[in-house]
Amino acid sequence: MAAGLGVKAAPFTYVAHALAVAAAVMVLVWCISFRGGLAFEADNKNLIFNVHPVLMLIGYIILGSEAIMIYKIFPKLNHDTTKLIHLILHAIAIVLGAVGIYCAFKFHNESGIANLYSLHSWLGIGTISLYGIQWIFGFVAFFYPGAAPHVRRGALPWHVLFGLFVYVLTLATAELGLLEKLTFLQSSGLDKYGAEAFLVNFTGLVVALFGAAVVVAAVAPAHVEEPEGYAPIPVN
């Protein structure tokens, strides 16, 4: 669709990067200035939880988004080099996401809170599992040992489509997480119209816009001819 409308990827990568910086700053301001800081070990267990949204947004979503857009950010770069960067960024995103999830479990366990009772937690485990499966498939099919060329050509559109599905599911999970945490805080007395509440809500809006820009950048053509073996999803 983006290609059919004559939309190029480059402007959306610029918008995505600006929104990524904004989202990263907002989540850091929230967790450090409003929530007291970050820690892996602390008497104040909330500091352990604060690591969770920071790593999930900056480490998991933003780095994963960079991996998705890398073919459009550097369209003239050697395809094998771009593919390696794509693979490494996704791997780092998965690791940081796993650490972020660990911090949520650690906070719950040390605070006497049950685990895996909410839709956010179910989707969180589901999405990072799908993300890992997607990464393994991509590694085996497109990197090492690598499938036959005709198999790669047939698998690529599905790899891209499934990757974007997992990405959108990840964004939805993040939005649910922000909503869930803000609801808990407001039920504990946080001002519904206070600065912190507005910051969290605006963070959610920025993340949504960021995700939209990334998806458009992923499906739109680059401003130069696509490298061999990679093209935007065809839309008939």
Swiss-Prot record:
Residues 33-53, 106-122, 175-196 are extracellular. Keywords: Electron transport, Heme, Iron, Membrane, Metal-binding, Oxidoreductase, Transmembrane, Transmembrane helix, Transport. Its cofactor is heme b. Disulfide bonds: none annotated. InterPro entries: CYB561/CYBRD1-like (IPR043205), Cyt_b561/ferric_Rdtase_TM (IPR006593). Monodehydro-L-ascorbate radical binds at residues 116-125. Heme b 1 binds at residues 52, 120. Its EC number is 1.-.-.-. One of its GO terms (molecular function) is metal ion binding. One of its GO terms (cellular component) is membrane. Binds 2 heme b groups non-covalently. The keyword Membrane applies. L-ascorbate binds at residues 67-75. Residues 1-11, 75-84, 144-153, 218-236 are cytoplasmic. Gene3D superfamilies: 1.20.120.1770. This is Probable ascorbate-specific transmembrane electron transporter 2. The lineage of its organism: Eukaryota, Viridiplantae, Streptophyta, Embryophyta, Tracheophyta.
